[in-house]
Amino acid sequence: MASHPIVHTDIPATDPKAAGAFYAAVFDWQIQTDPTFDYTMFQAEGGPAGGFTLIGRDEDAVPYHYRAGEVLIYIGTDDIDNSLRKVAAHGGEVVLAKTEIPDVGWWAVFRDPSGNRIGLFTSVPRG
């Protein structure tokens, strides 16, 4: 059986850098900004990494629109295409098709039968 752990979490924020400062002060999370993607990332001890993504970004600028109150978890998968086929076969809906993150991997977003939006992620093979 394949492993499908939660590998990443996106927390929407009106000001990602301020959100990072808040969580660092309250929970001692390690915060780092990736200038390549203008993305503020966090690492919580003992948990998966994540990031603070800007609410209300221009829909044309990013392939997925984040909303306040919708924390998005990402499930790791070795085969996003196969996972999306299974989602559709079992009553889910693909919201964002497989999309490349250059030099990082691929991601996608689906809606489960209860209406929850969940992300999928596959890393670029390292060799």
Predicted regions and their residues:
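Glycine-rich acetyl-CoA-binding "A-motif" of GNAT/NAT acetyltransferases
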Residues: 117
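Short glycine-/small-residue motifs
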Residues: 120
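Vicinal oxygen chelate
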Residues: 1-7, 20-78, 82-111, 123-127
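Conserved beta-strand-loop-alpha-helix junction that forms the acyl-donor binding cleft
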Residues: 13-15
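Helix-turn-helix
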Residues: 10
